[in-house]
Curated annotation (Swiss-Prot):
Its EC number is 6.3.5.-. Pfam families: GatB_N, GatB_Yqey. InterPro entries: Asn/Gln-tRNA_amidoTrfase_suB/E, Asn/Gln-tRNA_Trfase_suB/E_cat, Asn/Gln_amidotransferase, Asn/Gln_tRNA_amidoTrase-B-like, GatB, GatB_C_1, GatB_Yqey_C_2, Gln-tRNA_amidoTrfase_suB_CS. GO terms for biological process: glutaminyl-tRNAGln biosynthesis via transamidation; translation. Keywords: ATP-binding, Ligase, Nucleotide-binding, Protein biosynthesis. Belongs to the GatB/GatE family. GatB subfamily. This is Aspartyl/glutamyl-tRNA(Asn/Gln) amidotransferase subunit B. Heterotrimer of A, B and C subunits.
Amino acid sequence: MHFETVIGLEVHVELKTDSKMFSPSPAHFGAEPNSNTNVIDLAYPGVLPVVNRRAVDWAMRASMALNMEIATESKFDRKNYFYPDNPKAYQISQFDQPIGEHGYIDIEVDGETKRIGITRLHMEEDAGKSTHKDGYSLVDLNRQGTPLIEIVSEPDIRSPQEAYAYLEKLRSIIQYTGVSDCKMEEGSLRCDANISLRPYGQEEFGTKAELKNLNSFNYVRKGLEYEEKRQEEELLNGGEVLQETRRFDESTGKTILMRVKEGSDDYRYFPEPDIVPLYVDEAWKERVRQTIPELPDARKEKYVNEYGLPAYDAHVLTLTKEMSDFFEGAVEAGADVKLTSNWLMGGVNEYLNKNQVELQDTKLTPENLAGMIKLIEDGTMSSKIAKKVFPELAENGGDAKQIMEDKGLVQISDESVLLNFVNEALDNNPQSVEDFKNGKGRAKGFLVGQIMKASKGQANPQMVNKLLQQELDKR
């Protein structure tokens, strides 16, 4: 029997507002524990929540960017549960009347475009953070009350690979809107995954398991891959998949039972009595709609149609707004479009990955990268020299030409000097000269390599090729 995988994702995104969802406390990451709290966050008796209008605006902006309908009327509800990092013993959320519904995003997997539906986007407040030690627990309530949006997909995802693509696209869109930085390492983007299997052709869904502790997109994919195999083995062996919550163990790559899955009835939802329903008229919707910036799909189309980039380059460059903005800035500063694309996808990305830093953590600017690329383009700097100059540019900034001169890496373009290197290579490698005359094209490449080696990579490669051909023709 063959099974079809059915996946739905619940993504929590922290909004980067200055203050919290229902209190004036700061909502910034990284403060001293329990320093960003007040009487509302701590659930003192008699205090009343006040809705953060900026959070509502940004929830609407995210909804619109995800092609959702904005509800004219929505409301807040109490989700009741007890946990040490939840002082009220309930969370203010939206249950049956969310701010946004019926959206979608398009993803690309193996060159094919697929539309993934989005059921809803609702607003809620975040809980605090518990840290469990040996025999005791620590609670930090700085995060308590931070504005969240939860984005719930339709069960349209059919593989872990599609889930990964969906998360990449969703993060990209949200980052472009500016409502969140979506940093998983800081907890501003978190994901729970629901997965079930059913025989191919069956309409009814199978019993799902919910996966938690998915701290990166790779862990989402790995957790789903493991759970896919686990459920398939269970069903093929005549067993039954139970509705439960499981945790992904990063060290073993397996999912582990946490608890039997609760249903919505367990939370005893009821309307929040301290907050009136939220009414959004057309004028408010239009004001928010005007704030939506250019989104990744529009930029990707522009890069292909206006800049002439391959679709793959356009896809990579638009994955993050930071990289896309940097690319556009370098092009505006006069850098060649394709060379800039190649450097950002190649040398720049390699440097960032090797040093485990973000683009904003370096001293690179669109202008100083453009300056280096223009030197490559006009032949002043070879690609080999550029690779030696670039780390200095990224670490300390400055001017690429000045760095090249300070390091003694100025490209040799003097014809008489280059001819000496060329003739020396020809004299030292008579067999390669003979091979070239006999039609072996690789021999010329070898000779070029010898010349570049002798010049320590500083010979102008275009002139080397020209002079080498000229001298070979004489022999």
